[in-house]
Amino acid sequence: MSRPSRVLGLPLLSLGLTLLVSTPLQAQEAQTFRAVKQDLVKLYQSHPSTFYCGCNIKFSGKKMAPDWESCGYLPRKQANRAARIEWEHVVPAWEFGHQLQCWQEGGRKNCGKSAEFNKMEGDMHNLFPAIGEVNGDRANYRFSDWNGKPNQYGKCQMLVDFKEQRVQPPKGPVRGQIARAYLYMGEQYGLRLAAQQRKLFEAWDRQYPADRWECERNRRIGKLQGNTNPFIEKQCQ
């Protein structure tokens, strides 16, 4: 009877190890946009600064609010929305969602049933804290650089061209982070990027390398989510 028990034990041991090894990946796949917000709030308590405008972030429990005075921000039109922090998808949900069958059959709401969409929507490498008004104004517009003069949000250097549906982000680290988020999402999920957009992001990636915070953020998200952004990783070694 001892031999059969050893034979049965090996598959059971193998199964146990498989489950143990698979747990982080399964946890990653189970993450949703709603769930990861809690981890992101904790993450940014050590770096309380908004994306795009660089305003200080004030914390009250789980709630976050921008400090306009810290960055000279002035609302363009929607003061109420500008008073809160929203989690910005640098690669918009429409951009990675509309390529999926679920979106084509019923839009974003229908994609809520898709594990593939939920994984992309909840990928923390693509999520950044932004002033709500700026997040709303950016919408699904493409990033660009036409040497426009920012004048819509006080001292914030973000510029939105509503007529041409394009956005000029501030020069500096933000552009590098945008580029590496796009390049990552393209490689990680097979998203198709227009040749002109890819060329722009590759240029920004070279021009604005990862700083200390971007490296730290990447490392900590890697622990939370189970994978790092290789476009950041190679610049942090």
From Swiss-Prot:
Residues 1-27 form the signal peptide. InterPro entries: Endonuclease-I (IPR007346), His-Me_finger_sf (IPR044925). GO terms for cellular component: periplasmic space. GO terms for molecular function: endonuclease activity. Disulfide bonds: none annotated. Its EC number is 3.1.21.-. Keywords: Endonuclease, Hydrolase, Nuclease, Periplasm, Signal. Its main location: periplasm. It is found in: Periplasm. Belongs to the EndA/NucM nuclease family. PANTHER family: ENDONUCLEASE-1. Endonuclease which is capable of degrading plasmid DNA. This is Periplasmic deoxyribonuclease. It comes from Aeromonas hydrophila.
